[in-house]
Amino acid sequence: MRRLITILPLLLFVGLGVAFLRGFDRDPREIPSALIDKPVPEFDLPPLPGHKQGVASADLKGDVQLVNVFASWCIPCRAEHPIVSRLAEHDRVPVRAINYKDKPEDALAWLAKNGDPYTAIGADRDGRTAIDWGVYGVPETFLIDRQGRIRYKVPGPLSPAIVEGEILPLIAKLRSE
């Protein structure tokens, strides 16, 4: 019994160490989404003032496209914006946007300063649509297939590595289906 009491703390320490090290094998950006391979949630967002088109679930069928959730107050959104712009400019994929919990005048000023690569922008003033999409924070980007199903989600800012290594190959695959 005495021997067990001396060995027990050591076993507990080793067990905690193994559990801790296993955590390093996981990608902290991988946040599971229950919406992967499911149809986009039903929604219909009005456009930002001065824009012709908002974004609705019906718009997300027929072509492979991205939906980017952004806000003018979001610092990582500014960092990823050139990447989103390059994706849209080179006709690689249409990009629609959900402007999350933002003042319209701030969003418009941000787009005027940084450029507007979006096919359409829906104003989600109260954040309700983002909740339905399972958004944890901004930015987040979703890849939508031709049938209007969410096929991939990037929580956090896009990076060239994510675009080249994951998004573009998946776009090519979805377009060939």
Predicted regions and their residues:
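N-terminal targeting signals for export/organelle localization
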Residues: 1-46, 177
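A short beta-strand-turn-helix
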Residues: 43-66
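Structural microenvironment flanking redox-active thiols in thiol-disulfide oxidoreductases
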Residues: 78-115, 125-131
